[in-house]
Amino acid sequence: MDISRIRALRGPNLWTRQTAIEAIVRCEPDERAIDSQPEFEATLRERFPQLDPWPRLPEGMSLAHALKRVALAFQAHAGCPVSFARCTETVEPGTYQVVVEYTEEAVGRAAFDAAVRLIAAVRAHESQPFDLATVLAPLLSPIHL
């Protein structure tokens, strides 16, 4: 998974009236069908059991879809009232636009970065435990400034 651009959409935009983080994410062929890799979802849920269930998509679930869901869930668990996220494949196969709502830009960016790190750790089969409190701490600090 390669992220070529991340930007903050600081007002009404093509996707939503809310503020959002938009990223361009390129996935390799094996990263475009993670729903056919049950060990990925199982390992991700071991590390982040608070993650909501995923719907089965007709086109399959990519790492970009997982990134969207994890970034949104991190913000929700940090107490941010967010609900909007989209992942849309572009005209270039394997390239996705990922959009995740935020209420505080610093929190949205930190949640997105934490989601990237978690997915990379799961893909690399890292064995160190995932501590949700440690991940949420930097997400909470900008709110209390």
Segments from the language model and where they lie:
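Residue-identity detector for threonine
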Residues: T16-T19, T43, T88-T90, T95, ...
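His/Glu-rich zincin catalytic helix
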Residues: M1-G79, V116
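Acidic/histidine-enriched alpha-helical segments
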Residues: V122-L145
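M16 family metallopeptidases and their MPP-like homologs
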Residues: Q75-I119
